[in-house]
Amino acid sequence: MAKDLLFEIGAEEIPAGFMPNILGQLKQLAETKLNDAHLPFESIETYGTPRRLALIVKGLADASAEISERHKGPSASIAYDADGNATKAAIGFARGKGLDVADLVVEDGYIYAETKTAGVPSKDIVSEMLPQLITGLNFPKSMHWGDLDAKFVRPVRWLVALLDEEVIPVEFATVQSGNVTRGHRFLGADEITIKNAASYVDTLKENFVMVDQDARRELISKQLHDMAASKNASIVWDDDLLEEINYLVEWPTALCGGFEESYLALPDAAIITPMKDHQRYFPLVGQDGKLLPMFLTVRNGSDHSIEVVQAGNERVLRARLDDAKFFFNEDRKKPLIDRQDGLTKIVFQEGLGNLADKTERLLKLGRVFGEECGLHEDAAVVLERATELAKTDLTTGMVTEFTELQGVMGKEYALLDGESPEVAEAIFEQYLPRFAGDVLPQTEAGKVLSIIDKVDNIVATFSRGLIPTGSQDPYALRRQTIGILNILLGSEWNISLRPIFKASMELLNVASDKQEELLNQVEEFFTLRLKNIFLDREVPHHVIDLLLSNNELSVADAEGLVNALLANRIDENVELVQAYTRMYNLVKDVEYTGVNSDLLKEDAEKALFEAACKASGASLAAWEAGDYAAVVAVPATLVPTINQFFEDVMVMDKDEAIKANRLQLVRLAYSVMSIIGDISALK
């Protein structure tokens, strides 16, 4: 008879940002453990609130499945003597499998042992598994408490472990499991008996705990939208904020608060940021899209004394907005252009000067990038001015207090200073994209400023030997690299980043004898990120390996070639790979110096020379035209001629001059085919 398992870990308040990952881990870990134990089940559900992690496994079998295995032993000629008696080899093999010699079977000239392992009761499997679920979870930060060696994301206060109605003994950090949980910290009972897994969700709901995070999220969203509609307003919606609030409450109740209209004189960002990022409030806008002097938030509790909670939230926000108003008024006393001197007081990175130094590097790097990509003159003028002002908002009180507003306030202040909208937008766009899925810069100047700022950050950090390893990436270099690549993938710039990296190293005064190693490290870092981008698009590994074997490719070329390679189905062309590999084996150590056409004697070698020259011209023309389908098609056109050449011509001729010339010919054909990369990667 199938059973249901309930396992709840009760703890001090768990950080909201940790919860989705923890619940995902818990489910995956339980699935793995049960599958490894061959214990069938119907479904696994995980639940989470600030104070608890819960797992419910439905339809758990009474015992694990019986396991039948067939083990191959030595050959029958070794296992038995001429009279058919078992030898030591057979006896030892049988003993090792827990069988008698008589249980062995002979098949295809070998002996086999067939064993069966009885199923293990589910209670025994679960008893061993549950402590492993606790210790198997990984957290961004763990903690110890008391004088215990145990560690967890937060101190564990209670455990519930039930297989149907039977308590499964589990101990962790001196806490013993039972069938008693706790309700809402202020509204529910301190001790609540859980009968079984089926009653868990409803029993907690009776004690002001909505343990199902999906139902809780849906309720919060409905409450917020209903309340906004009642105010004839719309919410400045944020899914991430909803997710955070969802894991901050066990019994959600939405409320609406307000603030004085005078604060609306501040830039919208100066109001929205304190609301969302600091207080976890949802701003409201009217039918005209303009901010209203109201906000929505969610209380972890009932509507009892809701007006007191509302007043408290209003008071806290008012203090935040007073700060913002003060900083804004102080900041406006000095335009951005007059704040450049302040950049000398802000350190960029240890040993790499200050932000004034960085600004000078960006001005020069922007000119290099502009030349490489053929930036329009108007955009170049915008880029120059935006770069001069790019970091000046970091000296303002507003950005010092609300660091999330870097670039945002730069744009606001630039507009108030009378700078052009294009300059202001580029100042904002330098930080895009700020996170996965964020918008990319849309203006030409903004794209360039974003790229060169990130390149300077990456090369500077690498030059200090601070290369990200494992999960450690304190300077967010992976995110910045992916940002650069996504900007380039979405642009029309067909440029290589290598000249930009080299210029950056020069501007950072990297020693000449260190530059090649640093360049290789940075390019490898970018290549891996680009590979991951293509893997996320489900591009096959071998196609990516072919593509990225060509270090000279621009990101735009890589994008075009990926699409062309997939459309061409080049990875299915076995003859192409074979011909390419054969040439590689012949000329991998041969340096190309040129083919002497006067030494070509055989028709097949003359034909190959003509075909290779023609293919080379076609490839170059296709590259220049951006016709990636034509570029990808070129290597296959050489295959019949190459095969005929190898069939009719002896490359390693006795005449050294002819031999050397034929190797040069093969090298030429190989080079033409390699224009898209190392085709042998398609093996």
Explain the meaning of each model-derived region.
Residues 1-683:
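Amphipathic alpha-helical "coupling" segments that flank catalytic cores
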